[in-house]
């Protein structure tokens, strides 16, 4: 990866200042731990904020501005946002005009960056752009089929599930902490996409579905990874795991990229690893993110 330019550094620095001025952190929503210690995000106040949304203790307005959400889920900066905007324009520019995309971007009142700085006609949340680019890439590469099924490990606020619904008409079985799953389902319902949420594994043809995990699987302990391997990964005919194991493996006691690759192959999955995929943005390359993938 080329060195970051002064322009890019200033861009991200301005974003951090701008974002910090607009983040909200109401103490009454962030008390408690909400954690079982099994993952990086479960040790942060994010699950508490998700539970508040899922239970109806708060509305969705401003949800994506909560510090707890910004620290874990709403994390993409403007330099990466501009990168993803470029990918979207290259792959399917017309989708940017879809009102359903606008509804997803508006949900939770995220902090947006001006359109001209992203190379777009209007402001967007950079995180929204990453989810949209990911959904387009998954469809483009044949991992998520039109009208297909996705098992998503680590669902955030539901952004990728929503984008897969709009881009591919795909339904998603969410796998996360119960309160996070419930919060993401609420988001899907409020965006008119509730019918694309699968409540359980009933009726899922595992051989014809795609297992997707945007970082989350590599932020789990080995024990949890083993359980998910048996329950969700082994039978999935296709899979994409965006891995930041290089950052978190030692911290959480998870596996390195090579250990993950061996785990998948030992389970009979024809897995490969790609560190140059055109989905990976500047921050991914800086953090040595890789994509583990397979197609049976």
Predicted regions and their residues:
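Conserved Class I S-adenosyl-L-methionine-dependent methyltransferase catalytic core
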Residues: 32-145
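Conserved class I S-adenosyl-L-methionine
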Residues: 146-156
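Class I SAM-dependent methyltransferase SAM/SAH-binding core
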Residues: 170-193
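S-adenosyl-L-methionine
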Residues: 186-206
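A short SAM/SAH-binding and catalytic strip from SAM-dependent methyltransferases
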Residues: 209-223
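A short, conserved alpha-helix within the catalytic core of class I
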Residues: 220-232
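Conserved beta-strand signature within the Rossmann-like core of class I S-adenosyl-L-methionine
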Residues: 236-248
């Amino acid at each position: 990866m080329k060195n970051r330019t002064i322009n890019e550094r200033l861009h991200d620095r301005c974003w951090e200042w701008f974002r910090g001025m607009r983040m909200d952190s109401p103490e009454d929503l962030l008390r408690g731990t909400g954690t079982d210690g099994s993952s990086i995000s479960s040790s942060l106040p994010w699950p508490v904020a998700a539970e508040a949304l899922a239970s109806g203790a708060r509305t969705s307005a401003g949800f994506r501005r909560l510090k707890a959400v910004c620290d874990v889920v709403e994390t993409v900066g403007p330099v990466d946002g501009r990168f993803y905007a470029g990918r979207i324009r290259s792959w399917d520019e017309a989708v940017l005009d879809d009102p359903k995309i606008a509804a997803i971007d508006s949900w939770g009142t995220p902090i947006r960056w001006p359109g001209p700085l992203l190379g777009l006609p209007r402001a967007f949340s950079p995180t929204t752009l990453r989810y949209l680019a990911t959904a387009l890439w998954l469809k483009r590469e044949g991992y998520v089929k039109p009208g297909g099924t996705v098992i998503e490990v680590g669902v955030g606020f539901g952004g990728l599930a929503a984008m897969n619904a709009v881009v591919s008409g795909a339904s998603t079985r969410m796998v996360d902490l119960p309160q996070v799953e419930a919060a993401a389902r609420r988001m899907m319902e409020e965006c008119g996409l509730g019918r694309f949420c699968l409540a359980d594994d009933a009726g899922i043809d595992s051989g014809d579905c795609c297992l997707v995990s945007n970082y989350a699987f590599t932020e789990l302990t080995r024990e949890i990874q083993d359980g998910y391997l048996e329950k969700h990964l082994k039978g999935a005919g296709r899979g994409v795991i965006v891995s930041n194991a290089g950052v978190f493996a030692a911290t959480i006691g998870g596996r390195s990229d090579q250990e993950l690759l061996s785990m998948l192959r030992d389970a009979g999955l024809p897995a490969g690893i790609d560190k140059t995929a055109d989905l990976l943005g500047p921050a991914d390359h800086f953090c040595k993110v890789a994509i583990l993938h397979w197609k049976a």
